[in-house]
Curated annotation (Swiss-Prot):
One of its GO terms (cellular component) is chloroplast thylakoid membrane. It holds the Pfam family Cytochrom_B559. It comes from the Eukaryota. It comes from Phaeodactylum tricornutum (strain CCAP 1055/1). This is Cytochrome b559 subunit alpha. GO terms for biological process: photosynthetic electron transport chain. The keyword Phosphoprotein does not apply.
Amino acid sequence: MSGGSTGERPFSDIITSVRYWIIHSITIPSLFVSGWLFVSTGLAYDVFGTPRPNEYFTQDRQQIPLVNDRFSAKQELEDLTKGL
């Protein structure tokens, strides 16, 4: 199979270029820091709607919110979320 050139730079040329490492030495750490801030500030809980670790169990509801019967799951979920 003799394939032609796609006109793209070889990967080895890209990762050995100085420009690649200048760009990525800034972007990779900044992505890490922004992800850490997203989680550590609690914004991830607000964006995705998940409860914070201290909100899983309230004073009124100390049992595990578990659905037991798949055919009456809607009613069980309504009962579990009634006090929220």
